Amino acid sequence: MLRTISILGLVFIGIYSCRKNNQTNIPYVPVNESLVLAEPSNFPLTSVGGWVYLQSGYRGIIVYRKAFNGDSEDFIAFDRACPRHFDQDCGRLNVETNDLYLACTCDGKRWLLINGFPEQDDAGFLQQYQTTFGSGILLIRNF
């Protein structure tokens, strides 16, 4: 019995020690955006690979359309705050001209726009927001 408990404890520790820490230090700011895709300012989101900047969030939000299935999985939204420099003036992420990466203007660290994964392990994780899509309206929230 004691051996079984010890083995289960080791398995539990092993599973949870391998998890990546996806938490960010970016301060919490309530986000509750509603985008109508038919509006001209949101036209880039009507096609795969399109993106728009929003003024909400901590340093702004980038919304990217990664698929065209007609559901919430089509979109991804991140705060534009750099995880490493969010409290500095240069700590705002911008989409690079190739439309593939977000880059920090402080140190040039990059994240894939399609999923927010860092190009380098030490870059940190982006603050992602929940997206819900239906009837031509995209909701972006963090609550």
Task: Place the predicted regions along the sequence by residue.
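Sec-dependent bacterial lipoprotein signal peptides
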Residues: 1-18
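Generic hydrophobic-segment detector
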Residues: 4-7, 39-40, 106
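N-terminal pre-ligand scaffold of iron-sulfur
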Residues: 20-98, 112, 127-143
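Short cysteine/histidine-rich metal-coordination sites, predominantly Zn2+-binding motifs
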Residues: 96-106, 118-131
